[in-house]
């Protein structure tokens, strides 16, 4: 079907006579119908990828690309005087995720569909997502982020289940979003909602009655957990998700002929982080309800469930108080106790018990009763095996494996950077769109001046696009000829946005002293801080204060500017990543499981400035030392220092004059004049007296390496070679490769 026919059928108009809104909804209808007409992935055995988050981003352009009609639609629009970019702006971004965990899940379902595998994503249909971030007086404020409209991507199904909590029962409803594979088949994102959800209990902020479960259950992703009511609500949410998922799994297996004793032949469950962990006892409970005895039910579930660990941070491995579960899901506690008793009967190491110190350890349950445990980057998996989960690795060495994360090149190159995609196709053909390893062929052009010039021109165009977009959206005045130095990711101390901010202060002082950079520098930040994460919000406050001070200083702003984008999301990422020159991946070594932003930037020709952490290690191995800028202490040094417990941040502060000057500036009159003294002093004291993620030991190395990167940028031809090497080596990080490995080594769907 053509767009002209679609708008004629819907509005009885020509494209020229339609508004952009009308064209958008006609395109939405057309693509939904085309997706429904595609053959769904099928097979006896099915994967259920259960995740609390799916950060899918806007769907229109990605679906048009995967359906193979993007260029045709773009041409039709242009012939009628319309701009596809303006049409895309109308779409609201689904508020179904937050950070890398959710974006990974979204990339994975895209690859599952593209590879023709029989698998669905399963999660919750959040109405307001995490929150919409707004800046007010240099502070983060949180407001609801609605996205659901009557005419949208969600399709209401007839599937509904009663879900029993302690003292009351709620009714669920399943909504589907079709996930379109690239020139292939489709799969589904299956999102459960509560029938009694009530958006009216939310006002202009994200505050609401956390105890009214029947109205609030699916309103927000990760409700504020700074109080017990918020933490308890998370338990209700997680059980609601897995209870519905478990029933769906059993119903679909039975419909295909399973007697449930053979469930492992019909279903495999990937537990994405610890949020869906209760699916293990819930499946055991439901199998017992259907007549299977406890012993066999446990054996069946242990052959069905697999667990992905996404973190090295102990606080992120969920542990719920027993009394939470006894209140919210009392029917699960006898099963969880039985699972724990069986562990105790065969294992003497108390640190591996499921129930310990009045807490239920979700990851422990996943490891004992899952058939696979995987990390998400080589370094991460090695740290799990040798350190963080070593006690479990000794018990089950055969369960542990690595699956380095990946990204979908459809969204993160073809959709967000069509100019670079076209250049690549002109050089090596379009086989790379299906087999990302073909990007290696670009290595043949590293000494071709015409190719390097074109690559620089593509980058310059994307930088101009970002400048214009951010000027339109947020009023930023950006020098498109400056170095675009970008750090965009969830705000967390281990990701060390605070170290980047300290460098900005250091550079500010250098410029004030007359040491001006050869090329102007624009430092971009984008990050949301969890509402209850006070220090993270203080870091945002500092960055916004620096933005105000530096950008309004006529002595400094011609050489250095700072911009923090508001409400960073997938849509903004798709604008920023293609424009980036230097990708900041500066987490404390040993703390970032993998990262996927590093891969997206690399694919779009940015050079990584990073620690040897997460997937940075594999990027460095692929591109070589000349094509990445690494700094900082190695992971083992960091792990050893934590083990000794002898880190003293103040000692670094007192012996490093550059560091001392930068840290002191946080509480200077200059910053306090545009900021809040309480927030700034709290951050200052946190760094000076704690600095838990060791910003100070890496600071000198960071300055030195960042200056090397800026110096290297001046040789444009040599820089372009480094860009091309990075793009040519990015094929390994395709989520198609990751999912193929999951399937061959864990799921075994076909």
Question: Where is each model-derived feature located?
Answer:
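A conserved ligand/cofactor-binding region detector
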Residues: 1-750
């Amino acid at each position: 079907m053509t767009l002209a026919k679609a708008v004629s059928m819907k509005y009885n108009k020509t494209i020229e006579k339609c508004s952009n809104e009308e064209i958008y909804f006609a395109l939405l209808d057309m693509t939904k119908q085309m997706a429904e007409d595609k053959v769904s992935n099928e097979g006896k055995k099915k994967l259920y990828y259960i995740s609390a988050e799916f950060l899918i981003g806007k769907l229109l352009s990605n679906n048009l690309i995967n359906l193979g009609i993007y260029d045709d639609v773009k041409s039709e629009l242009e012939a009628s005087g319309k701009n596809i970019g303006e049409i895309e702006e109308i779409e609201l971004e689904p508020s179904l995720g937050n950070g890398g965990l959710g974006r990974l899940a979204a990339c994975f379902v895209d690859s599952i569909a593209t590879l023709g595998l029989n698998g669905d994503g399963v999660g919750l249909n959040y109405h307001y997502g995490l929150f919409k971030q707004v800046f007010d007086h240099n502070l983060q404020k949180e407001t609801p982020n609605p996205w659901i409209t009557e005419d949208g991507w969600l399709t209401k199904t007839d599937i509904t289940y009663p879900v029993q909590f302690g003292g009351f029962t709620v009714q669920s409803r399943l909504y589907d979003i079709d996930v379109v594979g690239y020139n292939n088949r489709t799969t589904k994102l299956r999102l459960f909602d509560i029938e009694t959800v009530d958006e009216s209990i939310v006002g202009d902020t994200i505050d609401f009655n956390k105890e009214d479960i029947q109205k609030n259950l699916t309103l927000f992703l990760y409700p504020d957990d700074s109080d017990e009511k918020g933490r308890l609500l998370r338990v209700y949410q997680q059980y609601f998700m897995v209870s519905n998922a478990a029933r769906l799994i059993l119903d679909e297996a039975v419909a295909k002929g399973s007697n449930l004793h053979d469930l492992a032949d019909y279903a495999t469950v990937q537990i994405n982080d610890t949020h869906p962990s209760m699916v293990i006892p819930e499946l055991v409970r439901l199998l017992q309800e259907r007549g299977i005895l406890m012993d066999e039910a446990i054996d069946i579930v242990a052959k069905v469930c697999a667990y992905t660990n996404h973190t090295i941070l102990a606080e992120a491995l969920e542990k719920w108080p027993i009394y939470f579960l006894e209140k919210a899901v009392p029917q699960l506690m006898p099963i969880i106790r039985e699972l724990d008793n069986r562990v105790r009967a065969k294992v003497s190491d108390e640190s591996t018990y499921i129930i310990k110190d009045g807490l239920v350890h979700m990851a422990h349950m996943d490891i004992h009763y899952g058939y696979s445990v995987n990390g998400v980057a080589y370094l991460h998996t090695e740290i799990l095996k040798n350190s963080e989960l070593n006690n479990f690795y000794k018990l089950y060495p055969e369960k542990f494996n690595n699956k380095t994360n990946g990204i979908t090149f459809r969204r993160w190159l073809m959709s967000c950077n069509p100019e670079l995609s076209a250049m690549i196709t002109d050089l090596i053909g379009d086989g790379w769109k299906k087999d990302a390893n073909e990007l290696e062929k670009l290595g043949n052009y590293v000494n071709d001046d015409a190719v390097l010039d074109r690559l620089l021109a593509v980058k310059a165009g994307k930088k101009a696009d970002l400048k214009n977009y951010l000027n339109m959206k947020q009023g930023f005045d950006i020098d498109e000829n400056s170095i675009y130095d970008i750090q965009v990711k969830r705000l967390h101390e281990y990701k060390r946005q605070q170290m980047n901010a300290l460098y900005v202060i250091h550079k500010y002082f250098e410029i004030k002293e007359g040491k001006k950079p050869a090329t102007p520098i624009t430092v971009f930040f984008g990050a949301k801080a969890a509402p209850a994460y006070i220090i993270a919000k203080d870091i945002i406050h500092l960055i916004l204060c620096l933005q105000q001070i530096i950008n309004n200083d006529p002595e400094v702003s011609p050489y250095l500017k700072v911009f923090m984008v508001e409400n960073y999301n997938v849509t903004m990422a798709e604008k920023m990543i293609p424009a980036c020159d230097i990708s900041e991946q500066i987490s404390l070594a040993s703390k970032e499981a993998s990262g996927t932003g590093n891969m997206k930037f690399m694919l779009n020709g940015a050079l990584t400035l990073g620690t040897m952490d997460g997937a940075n290690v594999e990027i460095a191995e692929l591109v070589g030392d000349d094509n990445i800028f690494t700094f900082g202490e190695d992971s083992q040094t960091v792990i050893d220092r934590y083990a000794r417990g002898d880190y003293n941040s103040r000692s670094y502060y007192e012996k490093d004059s550059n560091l001392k000057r930068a840290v002191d500036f946080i509480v200077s009159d200059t910053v306090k004049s545009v900021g809040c003294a309480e927030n700034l002093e709290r951050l200052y004291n946190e760094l000076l007296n704690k600095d838990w993620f060791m910003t100070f030991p890496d600071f000198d190395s960071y300055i030195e390496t960042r200056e090397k990167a800026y110096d290297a940028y001046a040789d444009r031809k040599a820089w372009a070679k480094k860009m091309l090497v990075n793009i040519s080596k990015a094929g390994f990080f395709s989520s198609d490769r990751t999912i193929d490995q999951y399937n061959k080594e864990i799921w075994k769907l076909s």
